Regions:
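Compositionally biased alpha-helical segments
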Residues: 8-199
Length: 199
């Protein structure tokens, strides 16, 4: 994208921020294309422009989207084709302060965070609780196929164990979790089903 196109892709829209003290402040928020989650936001109020990092506000809402600030532990292994770890299924973690987008809200909340490297993370929380990152990793192993050694892709799906604990007490959910992939549509569908759970 050219600089001119980048400027055109950004505009101010009416929104609000929630401060770390719990106050809600109406303001204009600069909205870009946001292929990845923003690592900071720019606001304007009464001709006063301010920039906020995740540690400086609790959340913000703009363009029918809500982002919450969180300090989380993310799985940061290489995720692009051609860069996957070989013979190493162990997750690698790093702490980061992020703006996570709320995808499904209620008693059980689902969030998404797409990093600057375009790695997609999903996070969960109960109402009022801290966010927890769902753990998933793609990796390669050597496998014999027709007598030849080839690389085969496997997946560490710890997130399914996390979700079984998270939805404990909801009848029939274990079977649904077992077939839920680590992708936005399937996870959103799973969380939407929870609204029908008697617990």
């Amino acid at each position: 994208m050219t600089l001119y196109g980048h400027i055109l892709a950004q505009k101010y829209m009416a929104g609000k921020i929630v401060t770390n003290d719990g106050d809600t402040v109406a303001c204009m928020i600069k909205v870009g294309k946001w292929d990845t989650n923003p690592n900071r936001i720019v606001t304007e109020r009464n001709n006063d422009t301010k920039k906020y990092w995740p540690t400086e506000i609790a959340s913000f809402h703009v363009d029918n989207r809500t982002f919450v600030s969180a300090r989380v532990k993310l799985e940061v292994s290489n995720h692009l084709d051609g860069t996957l770890d070989l013979e190493d299924s162990r997750p690698k973690f790093a702490n980061d302060s992020i703006f996570a987008e709320l995808i499904v809200g209620g008693k059980k909340n689902l969030y998404r965070y797409k990093s600057p490297s375009y790695k997609e993370h999903f996070l969960i929380s109960d109402q009022g609780a801290s966010l927890e990152s769902l753990v998933y990793k793609r990796f390669h192993v050597w496998a014999k196929v027709s007598g030849n050694e080839v690389k085969r892709e496997l997946h560490l799906e710890e997130y399914k164990n996390q979700l079984e604990k998270y939805f404990a007490g909801c009848p029939g959910f274990d079977g649904k979790i077992a077939v839920t992939g680590y992708e936005l549509g399937q996870l959103r569908s799973l969380f939407s089903l929870y609204s029908g759970c008697p617990n």
